[in-house]
Regions:
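Short, Lys/Arg-enriched N-terminal segments with co-localized hydrophobic residues
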Residues: 1-20
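Hydrophobic N-terminal alpha-helices or hydrophobic patches in metabolic proteins across all domains
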Residues: 20-132
Length: 132
């Protein structure tokens, strides 16, 4: 059916899109600095900086969200490399993981730093094997 074809094309183009973004340098505008709480869900505390990438729209119609690793103080913005993508299996949006260009993180290290929020979702962490 036409609808099923559209879903398959969407899934393939999404996979290509994710693979193309891994390793890219992006600028994250921080709207939830390290040490703050989620504006709506007050029990979610941000142990790392979190924000969005201006001009890149996510499937939820908002700008692409990103976790920032490797920065140990609250910041307003950060430029770094997309080292992983958190693909939520039960949500429409992915979260990108951005870190300083010269830092490497294992899947386990990434998971440890994002679980404060991702524990509420089913997800997989996508990354290039060369990041390990």
């Amino acid at each position: 059916s036409k609808n099923k074809q559209n879903c398959i094309v969407f899934a393939i183009s999404n996979t290509i899109w994710r693979n193309n973004m891994l390793g890219k340098i992006v600028k994250v505008t921080v709207d939830r600095p390290m040490g703050t709480y989620h504006p709506k869900y007050k029990d979610i505390y941000y142990p790392i900086n979190y924000g969005y990438i201006e001009g890149i729209m996510a499937p939820d119609g908002e700008e692409q969200d990103a976790y920032i690793l490797g920065v140990n103080k609250p910041v307003e913005e950060f430029t770094g490399k997309v080292i992983a993508i958190i693909h939520r299996l039960n949500d429409v949006e992915d979260k990108w993981v951005v870190a300083p260009e010269d830092e490497l993180y294992s899947k386990e290290q990434i998971e440890e730093q994002v679980k404060f929020q991702e524990k509420y979702f089913d997800y997989e962490i996508l990354f290039r094997k060369s990041n390990i």
